[in-house]
Amino acid sequence: MSVLWMVLGLAIGIAVGAAAGYIVCRSRTDRRLAETRADARSIIEDANRQAETLRREAELAAKEAAMRIKDEAEAEVRARRAEISRIEERLDNRDTALDRREVELDERRRRLSETEDELRRREESLAEREQEQLRALEEISGLSRAEAEERLFSRVEAELERRIGRMVRNRISEAEENADLEARRILATTMERLASDLTSESTVKAVELPSDDMKGRVIGREGRNIRAFEAATGVDVIIDDTPETVVLSCFDPVRREVARIAMERLVKDGRIHPGRIEQVVAKVRKEVEKEMKAAGRQALYDAKVSGSMHGDLLRLLGALKYRSSYGQNVLAHSVEVANIAGMMAQELGANVKIARRAALLHDVGKAIDHEAEGTHALIGGRFAKKCGESDEVVRAISAHHHEVEMQTVEDVIVATADAVSAARPGARRETTEVYLERLRNLEDIALSHRGVDKAYAIQAGREIRVMVQPSEVDDRIAAKLAYDISRKIEDELEYPGQIKVTVIRESRVSEVAR
């Protein structure tokens, strides 16, 4: 029974506790719900206030933007109106200027019309005067106008025919020169690059003696020393009345050089007799042989010729050192020709090696032309072939004086280089004299005319400048003077190409300021 009451009491306690807990929780829940609702109302009110604030700010910003856009639009309108006003002003000014220019043009047309009328009247007056003058001239000359014109035209026609013929000849000459223009350019380039030191070797060998008493010792008893010397050297010894001098004569330049050196050593030594003469001559001959080969090797170096060369050919090349032609040393001439030929071959794209070698050896025949028959070109070609030179080199040597037909460009180059070296003013005595004489004649022709003060031949005789006296020669006479000088040069001188005549008339006036 007691257990039942305990269970019942426990159940009642649990029920009462549960009811009390529910009541407590419900009261707390209601309180929290009320607080939450209050917070929600507060948040909503804050949100409404912020929304109102944002709306007002947006309305204010929109009003400000609208005002700014309106101001900008009004400013742009004002600027466009100002620009339109300026354009209208410029157009008005342009219209005014056009109106003013139209007035000026009308005035000019009027003046031009008046001037045209005046010129027409003057032209008619001049035509009438011309007719009067023609009638007067016809009465004075006894010729009609047609007859006078016919005579004048005949004279003019003859003069024009002569001048046209001369112009045709000049044009033909110019055409030929233009055809050779490239060759001339190559030659000019070659000569500009060439600088040669040439020394003319004298062909006369004279040995000075310390005194005339030495002549007797040179002659020897009954002339035995002279006979021994001539037999050993092959040179003629000439002893004449020239004081303190012995002359050696021989067509062979090498033998003449050997004799000169031997004679100088014998005279210096003082011991002159046949045995001593033979000994000295033999020694000198060996020295000269060595010197010839050394000169040949030096020539190979100076001419930039590569490859070996036969000893005999090298010796003959060195022998050209003692040979001269028109005052031009043959060995120096050969080296110069080799350098010219090398540069020309390089310009033309030819074989530089063959051109230089053949040019250096082109005159080697002159060293033995007294020993063999034929010209030096053919002799040199045969000797070069004998010494093992190539066919191209042999043919170029043989053909450089056109005695053998030229077949290659190297043949032409060697012949041209030889002509350039020989024809260069100053290279040979004979050429120099002819060249200077032509310049003197050219200046004399100019000085022979009245009013000429000075005359100078320049550009190697291709131009003459004539200074005239301004008080005697005016501009009109100066033109006629140039024509007269050119005609006289054509009639009296022979020259290649053309000669330009320049007449210079200069007036100078000076005053002193005090």
Curated annotation (Swiss-Prot):
Its EC number is 3.1.-.-. It is a single-pass membrane protein. InterPro entries: HD/PDEase_dom, HD_domain, HDIG_dom, KH_dom, KH_dom_type_1, KH_dom_type_1_sf, Ribonuclease_Y, RNase_Y_N. It is found in: Cell membrane. It comes from the Bacteria. The chain crosses the membrane at residues 3-23. The keyword RNA-binding applies. GO terms for molecular function: RNA binding; RNA endonuclease activity. Residues 330-423 form the HD domain. Coiled coil: none annotated. The keyword Metal-binding does not apply. Residues 203-266 form the KH domain. GO terms for biological process: mRNA catabolic process. Its main location: membrane. GO terms for cellular component: plasma membrane. It is an enzyme of class 3 (hydrolase). Keywords: Cell membrane, Endonuclease, Hydrolase, Membrane, Nuclease, RNA-binding, Transmembrane, Transmembrane helix. Endoribonuclease that initiates mRNA decay. Belongs to the RNase Y family. This is Ribonuclease Y. It comes from Rubrobacter xylanophilus (strain DSM 9941 / JCM 11954 / NBRC 16129 / PRD-1). The gene is rny.
